[in-house]
Amino acid sequence: MDAGWKFDNSYARLPERFFSKVLPTPVRAPKLAVLNRSLAVKLGLNEEALRSEDGVAVFGGNQIPGGAEPLAQAYAGHQFGYFTMLGDGRAVLLGEHVTPSGERVDIQLKGSGRTPYSRGGDGRAALGPMLREYIVSEAMHALGIPTTRSLAVVTTGETIMRETELPGAVLTRVASSHLRVGTFQYAAQWGTIEELRALADYALWRHFPGFEEAENRYLFLLEQVIERQAELIAKWQLVGFVHGVMNTDNMTISGETIDYGPCAFMDTYSLETVFSSIDTEGRYAYGNQPYIGGWNLARFAESLLPLLDENEEKAIALAQGALDEYPKRYHHHWLSGMRAKLGLAEEQEGDQELIADLLRLMEAHRADYTNTFRALTLGEYTGMALFDSAEFREWQERWQTRLSQESVSREEAYERMRRHNPAVIPRNHRVEEALAAAVHDGDYSVMERFLEALSDPYAYSPEQEKYAELPPPSDRPYRTFCGT
């Protein structure tokens, strides 16, 4: 039975510096844990074939589909500010699948064994972190945030050693590409200018049609990546998503969210929110994400300098001019998104102050971020100390006055809010509940019901009510781990 794979592997035609050909390491007993049916349909794949013994063997790395050219990608990165050589240490790119509609996507196996870039690691992944990536990436997709996606997770029938023995798994990740800021840093540091140019031309061909018309195609590349990242990070902030590990190797050229290791969603609103156990200094805190985005983009610009202009001073001036636009573009996307969350379609001078005052009140009263906007959308002001305060009532009057100045009806304004304020997000305690049932009890029904609720986050359906509930009070802050 044919699964429908159609591989055409353009990355494998880049100079060999950018990859090492390597096969996934077979696993003992691959068994399908979860298959993303809607994504399989979108990719033009046959679900029955994917669920078959041969299909599952592909997901486990035990069988290579026809046309695939497995390889591990080379890249570098600034990890918590320190530059290092990296590469796919536990992932193998099977190749690029071209869908019936002509879309080209990477098909990567994560947890598929050692590669030349493993640096002492075992190349494997645990079931818990792979299911976490599946849940959160699907939630992000449903929220309308550009992201890599997960086609399948298989258990391996093997255990791996981390702090304890854990069940092994392999995740099949689907991405527009796996080109990263760190890929360009690697080329600039260790490649020739011809190799750097080949990579840049490839990125333009793959992601930015229309580059032929640009006066300076490499400046165009920089500007396009800046715009996509400004919009992406604004979208993160608008839903309270904390990535947790914004190293330059985890910033994509495509503008998709990648690497869900220590990520989490904010409950109580605070700019200082950090979940990652290794982010002890708060470098990647919620409120710092826009700044780190700019820092990473500056590293991207540095990598492109030899291509921007032969004259170094001119190249630096061009790069700086593009980078200066980032905070403006980020602020534009964030402010228009915040207006939408408050039902505002038109721009007025006092909007920024209105938004800032609400966020200040939320922080002062330790209000839940998602549920505050949910309450504003529904007009139901119960269950939070914030709503009992005189300051909030005064703010609410100002907001209602501002809403009355819109040219659209009040109903249309509230409909706008519904489209921008999710009723449900993957709350951390619910993610843990789903993972515990699946990993420890082999019960995937909790995860399936959770994914169903997350699949339409703006529905405001009765079935979503329980997933909007806050976690029980705890003395211990929620902590995440990268899973490597």
Curated annotation (Swiss-Prot):
It holds the Pfam family SelO. It comes from the Bacteria. The keyword rRNA-binding does not apply. The keyword Ion transport does not apply. One of its GO terms (molecular function) is AMPylase activity. The active site is at residue 249. It catalyses: L-seryl-[protein] + ATP = 3-O-(5'-adenylyl)-L-seryl-[protein] + diphosphate; L-threonyl-[protein] + ATP = 3-O-(5'-adenylyl)-L-threonyl-[protein] + diphosphate; L-tyrosyl-[protein] + ATP = O-(5'-adenylyl)-L-tyrosyl-[protein] + diphosphate; L-histidyl-[protein] + UTP = N(tele)-(5'-uridylyl)-L-histidyl-[protein] + diphosphate. It is an enzyme of class 2 (transferase). Its cofactor is Mg(2+); Mn(2+). Its EC number is 2.7.7.-, 2.7.7.108. InterPro entries: SelO. ATP binds at residues 87, 89-90, 110, 122-123, 173, 180, 259. Keywords: ATP-binding, Magnesium, Manganese, Metal-binding, Nucleotide-binding, Nucleotidyltransferase, Transferase. Mg(2+) binds at residues 250, 259. Nucleotidyltransferase involved in the post-translational modification of proteins. It can catalyze the addition of adenosine monophosphate (AMP) or uridine monophosphate (UMP) to a protein, resulting in modifications known as AMPylation and UMPylation. NCBIfam families: PRK00029.1 (NF000658). Belongs to the SELO family. PANTHER family: PROTEIN ADENYLYLTRANSFERASE SELO, MITOCHONDRIAL (PTHR32057:SF14). This is Protein nucleotidyltransferase YdiU. It comes from Geobacillus kaustophilus (strain HTA426). The gene is ydiU.
